[in-house]
Amino acid sequence: MTASWSPTTRETDALQRHAHVQRLPRVDAVWPWLADRHGLIAAVDAPHAAHPERFNFGELAERIATAAAAFRRHGVNDGDVVALFAENSPRWLVADQGLMRAGAADAVRGASAPVEELRYILSDCRATALVVQNADVWRRLALPPEQRAQLRFVLQLEGEPAEGAMGWEAFLASGAGLDPVGPAGGRDAVATVLYTSGTTGQPKGVPLTHANLLHQMSSLACVAYPEPGAPVLSVLPIWHAYERSASYFFLSCGCTQTYTTIKQLKKDLPRVRPIAMATVPRLWEAVQAGFEDVLKTFPPSRQRLLRAALANSAAQRKAVRTARNLLLEPVSAAGRLRACGSAALRWPLHALASTLIWPKLRRQLSGGQLAYPISGGGAIAPHIDAFFEAVGIELLVGYGLTETSPVVSCRRPWRNIRGSSGLPMPQTEFRIVDPDNGQPLGFRQRGRVMVRGPQVMAGYLGKPEASAKVLDAAGWFDTGDLGMLLPDGSVALTGRAKDTIVLSSGENIEPGPLEEALVASPLIEQVMLVGQDERQLGGLIVPRAEAIVAWAAEAGVSVAQDLGGQPGDPALLRLLMRECNRLLKQRSGSRGDERLAGVVLVDPFSIENGLLTQTLKQRRDRITSRDQQLIDGLYGR
């Protein structure tokens, strides 16, 4: 069974409005077009950068052309690969697009990545030159003389240039007044080399062509179509495929993109009031947790009022979904009829809250006009989805991988099936196959997710054997994810094949959905399940300390206020394990082997300690390594 894109009238109209992108020969060709039509509209704004900058589309196009001429002057040729190790900023964009305009590709990574990873990328992509964010990155690399000699130049985007590096302003001055030589390659030329997140093993280089990226810039119009000048926020790492494609798309619409950071996001949301933003689930979890923290400071009577309004709105929206058959599981005619009645009964209070309460809350949470909150990089926990839907923020969950540029599916505003990752993008096909024999499966049958489309890479950089493992002769890419197709063509993910926990009984457990159920608890900040080759599952839990201490006290268990760095009081752990198993038992389709034999409290997983990727995915192997002694104790080893 294969599911492919079936265009609606809305999507056809949106693609037609965005047809200029489909006609572009290369990604970098979009800037003269934008300068000609939207030259005076603000394009990029970086208020928090080391050098705050703001350019309109005319100025941005001019700087990109100047950078391209400068790169050519310093020896960059068609087909070269230049490493770019820096974070989000207008200068990153100018360097990136200047390299493309000069005919080169960039191999990108964040400035804060481990030095060993940066050195590996520099060597693996055979970079002929290097662009770094600042002197610190260049010094940390500490390249040996023979590797330095292979680089034609080192360009520094910020600060006083270090020894052996060139400063940004001097670099641009070297290209001023020169006409950049146009690139020889077209759509099939490599535009960039991205590296997989490396949650396990060495990262692999993924060469993406201009055609791959242009497909994203065009097809995302099926999901969102903001008007020229509309404000958007960029908060995710620009060197990640998801933010990269989203940024290109929003800018190709003529939007004004403000660069923010996780630290500044709370202030920038009400200030910028974005129409659209590319996000990850962890961001929405943090926003919802912040709401809960603020709610606890209110008088009890006001807390009860808000919680009652929230529960009613969540129930009303769920009833509407059920009536419209927008659920993962099919709903009978009788069930849809009952849902219509429930939605009608709850409508008056929901309408009142939607007039008096939720607009104020939306302004505080997202700025008040976020029409396209696109979430990718992982599944959204059901309780997070339900909360934001209740207050009037419809999360548009998408799915993709670095190897697919990345978006292959996304929920549409008019077809938003909660629990799914949406419908295929234009010209994209899905197939679900049996994990054991590779035979195609039917609707609602779970198996490995295969995808084919114009956004899929041709293969890993210099790794033909690894490429052959994931790409077949017909162009089908094995995502490594597990999922199923719904009758309307939507794809729903159920887990990651390599994350599957196989118990000693031979039963396969997908930890993702179980972990989503557990983090719905106000007691749990983060969780990772373990149990490979064991009789039962176990849980590594990062607690919400204040909430868990108060909860334990109500149950008659006295624990220390500071829970950090300790496995936990035995009485507390037994209590917490029972609570976890209660939550797991409540899951739809819950199985008896999806229960925990024990839990331990662990320190947080973060980007800083290397246990989360830059897109906030757990590095399960590293977490296991850090907490191996606690896991051994959990199983009595």
Where are the regions a protein language model picked out?
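AMP-dependent adenylate-forming
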Residues: T12, A29-F55, V600-I607
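Conserved pre-ATP/AMP-binding loop-to-beta segment of ANL
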Residues: G39, Q156, A173-Y195, Q202, ...
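Conserved AMP-binding/adenylation subdomain of ANL enzymes
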Residues: L214-L233, I238-A334, C340-T355, P359
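Conserved ATP-binding/catalytic segment of the ANL
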Residues: P424, T428, N437-R444, R448-L503
